[in-house]
């Protein structure tokens, strides 16, 4: 049976499309076979009314900056720090607070379980997970560490961090000394850190290996001092990364936000009115896959990325083909080719 959107809509997991495998192949077609990749994760609020939809509840909406009634999906994407782009891999619907309480789990525990579910395929792409400051907790770091992943994220501005002791051992009994004084963000010891040379950032950035009290481990720390005097703290639990790589990975993470924006605006991420979890799962992932196909097509056609222009182009091509099909005569191919190009490019605008 040939799968179409209609006959695949609502199929159970065992019979449905392997979205992760499909999107990985599209990502490799877009980025190439290899690159400096990381797994970006981000929960996103989906507006939904009613009471009977599976997992409906109250979730945080970043756009509204408040908790709202609806659904939430955990978006998993692949980012490339060289092309500074993102391809979506999978969407997984989140449980609501009542369902989590019955399972004696927190939302962070649930996010870890989602990564565990797809770990086999994700580890083939990267061992790095990039997420916002919400995920910079010991529970999440230890949870993904067991699955073979390291975290790149951002600390709160008041995070408790220490310089790492690098001196000789005393030879005394007991645990070796690991910390060598708290890092005072208002009075940095520049002799213990390295200044980063990055042309595309404003302000000054420094990097060092530090000890995090909250995470209870050593991290590669990047201290970004902005022109207004404020400091932002980025880190990686993989200390082999350079400070430049940590900052590049975290800044590229924001590309997943643009994927959510374009999927909501152009490929119907929020349009499904189904009340079945398999149909919702299909709709969410079909939306992201449609976005991936559009990105690959635009790249291979040599088009600048613009979902608005691409959607207009595809609509025009569809209408032109319908007109030609309905004409019922043998066309002049040279003339029709010229007319086809003229008509299909109508209403193309920049995003």
Say what each PLM segment does.
Residues 1-194, 202-212, 222:
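Conserved, well-structured functional cores that handle cations and Mg-NTP chemistry
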Residues 12, 80, 238, 250-253, ...:
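Generic structural signal for hydrophobic core residues of well-folded globular domains
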Residues 45, 243-274:
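Short amphipathic alpha-helical "interface-anchor" segments enriched in bulky aromatics
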Residues 72, 255, 259, 285-289:
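Catalytic-loop motifs flanking and including active-site residues across diverse enzymes
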Residues 83-91, 104-108, 112-116, 164-223, ...:
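A short, flexible helix-boundary coil/loop motif
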Residues 134, 240-241:
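Short, surface-exposed acidic/glycine-rich loop or hinge patches that mediate macromolecular interfaces
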Residues 156-157, 224, 237-239, 263-266:
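Histidine- and/or cysteine-centered catalytic micro-motif in compact active-site loops
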Residues 212-240:
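Charge-patterned, long linear interaction tracts outside catalytic cores
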């Amino acid at each position: 049976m040939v799968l179409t959107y209609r006959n695949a809509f609502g199929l159970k997991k065992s019979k449905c499309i392997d979205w992760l495998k499909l999107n990985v192949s599209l990502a490799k077609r877009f980025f190439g076979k290899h690159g400096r990749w990381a797994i970006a994760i981000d929960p996103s609020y989906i507006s939904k009314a009613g009471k009977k939809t599976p997992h409906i509840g109250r979730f945080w909406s970043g756009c509204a900056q408040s908790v709202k009634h609806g659904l939430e999906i955990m978006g998993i994407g692949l980012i490339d720090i060289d092309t500074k782009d993102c391809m979506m891999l999978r969407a997984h619907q989140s449980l609501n607070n009542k369902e989590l309480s019955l399972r004696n789990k927190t939302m962070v525990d649930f996010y870890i379980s989602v990564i565990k579910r797809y770990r086999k395929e994700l580890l083939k792409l990267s061992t790095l997970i990039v997420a916002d400051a919400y995920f910079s907790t010991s529970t999440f770091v230890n949870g993904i560490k067991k699955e073979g992943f390291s975290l790149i994220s951002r600390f709160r501005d008041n995070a408790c961090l220490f310089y790492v002791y690098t001196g000789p051992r005393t030879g005394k009994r007991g645990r070796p000394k690991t910390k060598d004084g708290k890092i005072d963000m208002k009075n940095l010891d520049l002799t213990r850190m390295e200044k980063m040379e990055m042309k595309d950032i404003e302000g000054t950035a420094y990097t060092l290996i530090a000890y995090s009290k909250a995470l209870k481990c050593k991290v590669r720390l990047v201290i970004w001092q902005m022109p207004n005097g404020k400091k932002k703290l980025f880190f990686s639990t993989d200390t082999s990364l350079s400070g430049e790589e940590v900052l590049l990975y975290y800044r590229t993470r924001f590309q997943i936000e643009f994927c959510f924006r374009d999927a909501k605006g152009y490929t119907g991420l929020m349009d499904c009115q189904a009340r079945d979890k398999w149909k919702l799962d299909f709709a969410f992932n079909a939306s992201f896959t449609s976005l991936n196909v559009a990105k690959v097509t635009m790249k291979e056609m040599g088009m600048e990325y613009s979902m608005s222009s691409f959607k207009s182009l595809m609509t025009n091509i569809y209408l032109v083909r319908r007109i030609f099909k309905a004409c019922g005569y043998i066309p002049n191919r040279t003339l029709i080719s010229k007319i086809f190009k003229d008509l299909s490019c109508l209403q193309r605008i920049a995003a």
